[in-house]
């Protein structure tokens, strides 16, 4: 059974899901695929994990570099391929962007076979644990801010928060925006 709660952030309300031990989902309210893979859920704000999730989110929005390791995560849904893609996303260092091609190459190395950027993009779009599995750090080869289930406006805001220079919905490579 999944346990759910709502948490306010500077970019809107998020819905968090847990199996009681780990964070299994984090979606901006109303985003595409909200609460995907959640079945038999109960709302409970008293789960001890929520304190750590809330603190990690506060730290993140105050500019702390890497908060993802502060909270255990688990992928409870998805295909083996999707889980492989999501696991690779956790390897993207803070203040860094990778392209869909970069992610596809890394997933291909792990799976021992070629993987297309398009297939990777589809899996990234279904990422159930926003922010902690940083899919917002993946951009097109041109630097364009393509796709984000929480909305491109949020993707832009998250990348700027992390210090990237974003002009006309494109990350400017090699340029950092000082916050």
Language model features with spans:
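N-terminal positioning helix adjacent to the helix-turn-helix/winged-helix DNA-binding module
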Residues: 81-85, 116, 154
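A short, Lys/Arg-enriched interface patch at domain edges and termini
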Residues: 150-166
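Basic nucleic-acid-binding alpha-helical/helix-turn surface characteristic of O6-alkylguanine DNA
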Residues: 1-111, 161-179
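Major-groove DNA-recognition helix of helix-turn-helix-type DNA-binding domains
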Residues: 123-125, 132
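Charged low-complexity interaction tracts in eukaryotic proteins
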Residues: 130-149
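Short, positively charged loop/turn segments that connect secondary-structure elements
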Residues: 108-122
């Amino acid at each position: 059974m999944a346990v759910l709660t709502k948490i306010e952030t500077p970019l809107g309300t998020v819905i968090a899901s847990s199996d009681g031990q780990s964070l299994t989902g984090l979606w901006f309210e109303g985003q595409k695929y909200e609460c995907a893979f959640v079945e038999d859920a109960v709302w409970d704000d008293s789960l001890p994990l929520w304190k750590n999730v809330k603190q990690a989110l506060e730290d993140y929005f105050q500019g702390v570099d890497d908060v993802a390791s502060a909270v255990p995560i688990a992928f409870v849904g998805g295909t083996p391929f999707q889980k492989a893609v999501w696991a690779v996303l956790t390897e993207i260092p803070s203040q860094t962007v990778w392209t869909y091609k970069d992610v596809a190459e890394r997933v291909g190395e792990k799976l021992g076979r070629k993987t297309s950027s398009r297939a990777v993009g589809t899996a990234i779009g279904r990422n159930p644990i926003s922010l902690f599995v940083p899919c917002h750090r993946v951009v097109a080869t041109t630097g364009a801010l393509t796709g984000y289930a929480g909305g491109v406006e949020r993707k832009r805001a998250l990348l700027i928060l992390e210090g990237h220079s974003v002009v006309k919905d494109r990350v400017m490579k090699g340029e950092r925006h000082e916050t």
